[in-house]
A protein has these predicted regions:
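Short basic/aromatic active-site micro-motif
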Residues: 62, 146-147, 248-266
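Short, polar N-cap/turn motifs at the start of nucleic acid-interacting alpha helices
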Residues: 170-177, 248-249, 268-287, 294, ...
Length: 307
């Protein structure tokens, strides 16, 4: 269904009898399919966590009371507050779009819910000694590309999916850049490559050729030799490498946090880290501010040099 159709059809029934499930299926889902690569995740989240409670409610009938009850129900089911917030974000986004399409007059109900308490953002960083031992162990893995991928993630701060789905045509060695056509934020972004990153990519090319994997513009940077497709993830092999070097409670995504922490601790500004990580909002990067607590003191101490 086209969005134009959505706007035209809305006036016929929306204000009174459009239930959330129909809105999601007939209107919202086709809309996000047109631009959002992760629409399947939203579809799963909706039907798993939102539809059972709200699906049969009319859009205009959803009240803050319902949202509070739903939050309590999610909590009773054992979901962490951080997870509930993620579910709530989708519901809010759906209602915000409904307002923009004039399907409902406002989205106050989903914004007047009780405050959800959440602890500190989970931050797990590896120190240089751990990084060196982990990379060394990953290169010993039976997984043909684990070592290259892990090292590249630490060197670039890329999201795992950005490396996993990268193609050779996205890499410009002369410009020292890997282009992500559509990032998590829905925008094109550039990942800058250091000389070491370029060497790792060259090693990936050599490894691929030795395995008989095509290295053409349209081929994936890291391709499963058995399926000819990109790997779904690297978590199993990564977890084995972690266990072998005695590192606990670390995810692949924590390599991105490690990259950010190394930058901050070496004097890179939050603004620069934001750009390198591809964060759409400085609020996302602000979580790393505590990593360089002496920066303000250093600035004050340096002031006399300017006088």
């Amino acid at each position: 269904m086209k969005i134009a159709d959505t706007t035209t059809r809305s006036k016929a029934f929306v204000d009174h009898d459009l239930i959330l499930c129909r809105y999601f299926t007939d209107f919202y889902l086709p809309y996000i399919k047109s631009y959002k690569k992760t629409y399947k995740h939203d579809r799963y989240t909706y039907f798993k966590h939102i539809d059972p409670f709200f699906g049969k409610l009319e859009l205009n009938a959803i009240k803050a009371m319902h949202v509070d009850q739903w939050i309590a129900e999610q909590s009773d089911q054992g979901y962490k507050n951080s997870t509930i917030i993620k579910h709530l974000v989708l519901l809010k986004r759906m209602m915000r779009v409904a307002v923009r399409w004039e399907l409902i007059t406002n989205d106050k109900a989903v914004n007047n819910h009780r405050k959800i308490q959440i602890g500190d953002f989970r931050q797990k960083f590896l120190v240089p000694e751990q990084i060196r031992s982990l990379i060394k162990e990953c290169y010993k893995s039976q997984h043909p590309f684990l070592g290259y991928v892990v090292e590249l993630l630490i060197l670039t701060g890329a999201r795992c999916g950005e490396i996993r789905l990268a193609k050779w045509c996205n890499i410009d060695m002369d410009e020292c850049a890997l282009t992500v056509p559509v990032s998590k934020t829905g925008k094109r972004r550039t990942i800058y490559l250091s000389e070491r990153s370029k060497k790792v990519i060259a090693l990936i090319r050599k490894r691929s050729e030795s395995l008989g994997i095509p290295v053409t513009n349209d081929a994936y940077l890291v391709q499963n030799p058995r399926t000819g497709k990109p790997y779904n993830d690297f978590q199993v092999s990564f977890s084995r490498a972690l266990a072998a070097v005695g590192i606990n409670d670390v995810r692949v995504h924590d390599l991105r946090h490690t990259y950010a922490s190394l930058l901050i601790q070496n004097g890179v500004s939050l603004y620069e880290v934001q750009k390198l990580l591809g964060h759409s909002s400085p609020n996302m990067t602000q979580r790393y501010a505590h990593l360089n607590p002496n920066s303000l003191k250093q600035i004050v101490n340096n002031l006399p040099a300017f006088l």
